Amino acid sequence: MKVFKFGGASVKNSDSIRNIVEIIRSYGTNELIVVVSAMDKTTNALENVLELYLKNNQEYLKKIDQIFIFHDKICRDLFPKNHNVFSGLKNIITKLVSFLKNNKSPNYSFVYDQTVSYGELISTFIINSYFIEEKLKTNFIDARNCIKTDDYYRAANLNWELTQKNIKQQVENDSLIITQGFIGSNSNNFTTTLGREGSDYSAAIFAYALNATSVTIWKDVPGVLNGDPRVFQNTQLLNQISYREAIELAFYGASVIHPKTLQPLQRKEIPLYVKSFENPIKPGTAVSKGKTIEPNIPCYIVKKNQVLLRLSSIDFSFIVEENISYIFSMLHEYQMPVELIQNSAISFSVCVNNKYKRLEELVLVLRSKFNVEV
């Protein structure tokens, strides 16, 4: 069993979806799991929908219409008129609108997961329909029936035991499987998400549960580069790299691989390949046990939009272990990933990522115990 993951850029239009079919045919359609992200920038578009919705701005409905039009155009390029994919797409969009109109929850993270997950639900529905149109025998699996998590919305933690059991029960080893990345569900069957760009992690979860022979992430770059080509000039391809080096690069911001992807693969020594969907015959980058970085060159990472918090004691007392423990517990509660820390006798500085936009809440709580500068 192999696992392929196709990200948003690799399913951004009808030509990209046709390309996926060609890639799959070239590798063989048996014993293959295809994990798919939302198409192009759909996740961003759904985040914009949510932002307007939470402001009671009815313009959110127009944004949903734009999402529908984008996907409808792709379908018109791929399918004949009167194909049932068109009514199916409308039904999915109707469910999204219905959820938002009937939602009573004030929990932003809960509403986020129920809303943004529609990107993956739409993309897999369209792509599976196209596979069938192209006479590929597929087995469609809703990832929410397999990947079970806790209630930590937007960055849910996996229930490994139950997830493995579900995957083994639902996946037929000799078939072509298509499923969603990024999403799962909790014990109450509410949709959860695994963190932004979490489809890589989904692929690793399926690979781990099924003892896959490999995972391939298909990207719009030739593999893992030694720097972001949007920031640095003359970047070079890393032909091979170890799990350890890859996870360090991913943790500190190399966006080509999701940070959580490597751990489950490393446990079972499942190799990871990062390849270009635009040039699939090229070898890309191989990530596996014991590989030394090749070529042996420096790697560069730039992380934008970071926030530096400086905390100091109100009464000039020392910042001790108890204080630091409290600070970290609050960072966890308010979903603030930590990038760097520095402490001294009476101060503590921490660089955090405000990707969940809860900085104001966090600062308000911390100011009850510390002087806080942002």
Stretch-by-stretch model annotation:
Residues 214-218, 272-274, 339:
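Short hydrophobic alpha-helical runs that function as membrane-insertion/retention elements
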